[in-house]
Amino acid sequence: MELSSKKKLHALSLAEKIQVLELLDESKMSQSEVARRFQVSQPQISRICKNKEKLLADWCSGTANRERKRKRESKYSGIDEALLCWYHIARAKAWDVTGPMLLHKAKELADIMGQDFVPSIGWLVRWKRRNNVGFGARHVLAPSFPPEPPPPGLTSQAQLPLSLKDFSPEDVFGCAELPLLYRAVPGSFGACDQVQVLLCANSRGTEKRRVLLGGLQAAPRCFFGIRSEALPASYHPDLGIPWLEWLAQFDRDMGQQGRQVALLLAARVVEELAGLPGLYHVKLLPLAASSTTPPLPSSVVRAFKAHYRHRLLGKLAAIQSERDGTSLAEAGAGITVLDALHVASAAWAKVPPQLIFSSFIQEGLAPGKTPPSSHKTSEMPPVPGGLSLEEFSRFVDLEGEEPRSGVCKEEIGTEDEKGDREGAFEPLPTKADALRALGTLRRWFECNSTSPELFEKFYDCEEEVERLCCL
């Protein structure tokens, strides 16, 4: 005896359901006859009749996907509806709405609604399908009346003159992007060793944003097994700065603190971001295109580079002392992007707040006219041993020089080269490795007449490592 095959469910699209309703209204056909015509069950036709008003509303809205057969309600229907409302407003204003922009807005709406929701690409695809949303050419309706002229003296965001009087020094931020030859040593560097760094701080110097590094490698092997949220700085797999994502995070952070802040940017960057919606807590203030004043004082940028190079030379000297016969260039070739990320974070922390504040005042980028203390804070760390002040100063400003040909290839090497830390996977340390390392480090301190203050810092580190090992 053969088992009868299970009858396959035939779902109707929205367009077909409207045809069903039209047939029932305009003809004398019964629900059973209509069901046979569309090859569905009679109860399915009955459900269509019960949902008649909702189906007609979806059809008339013009936003529903008319070929969609099943409309499963989203778990976050409130976010769905709010995002769709924002989308229609954005399109009416002729904004170029992109996928990342919708993801950012969905997350922002979820935070406002108090929902623990992280939108994904898959969720966005389903949301677009549910609401018949596409990113084709814009069709903006012309207003039925001429726009009302702005009040006297009021200009658009792109035309705003640089005015800081409405902000306190704590709420005025400046940021700068700069190239950095992250593993260069005096007299030896290559262009392929470059990363792009984004620095941002407020004019008082009391708040520094997380350093962002952009590099050419999409997934450096030195990041294998690393949790990005545990790092003191961020890495972006491109030399270009991801302004949209960075500004969105900055805006969220300021919103959580209930602050309205000003961000000084180069006119070129502000022009590229023209029409960017969704910044509610960060006001972009462009510097004049003809201005030679950078949005983050050059003395602050130079101080960061000086501390970076000073710390890098210290690290390389330690490597040389461990490996006899290793040249400075050979030691530098082993520096990875991950090393550079940590050194950059430490160097940025070393830039003193007094220097930042005085530099903003001198450049006219901070509100108020009262100068800081007459005591001038040095922007340079102590000159490393083996270099004169002039040599170290030239090393700090290395990015302005032309790289020597051939050096880049030697420093990068190949994946098979021995000692190439960038091209090889290192085994992940275990909890036992971490505890043994603590014991080794303490023993080394004990044998080298370490100061009590350093032991206090070590105890804090030891306590935290032991806590993490117990998780």
From Swiss-Prot:
Residues 67-137 form the HTH CENPB-type domain. Residues 3-55 form the HTH psq-type domain. InterPro entries: CenT-Element_Derived (IPR050863), DDE_SF_endonuclease_dom (IPR004875), Homeodomain-like_sf (IPR009057), HTH_CenpB_DNA-bd_dom (IPR006600), HTH_Psq (IPR007889). Residues 31-51, 100-130 bind DNA. Residues 167-360 form the DDE-1 domain. GO terms for cellular component: nucleus. Belongs to the tigger transposable element derived protein family. This is Tigger transposable element-derived protein 3.
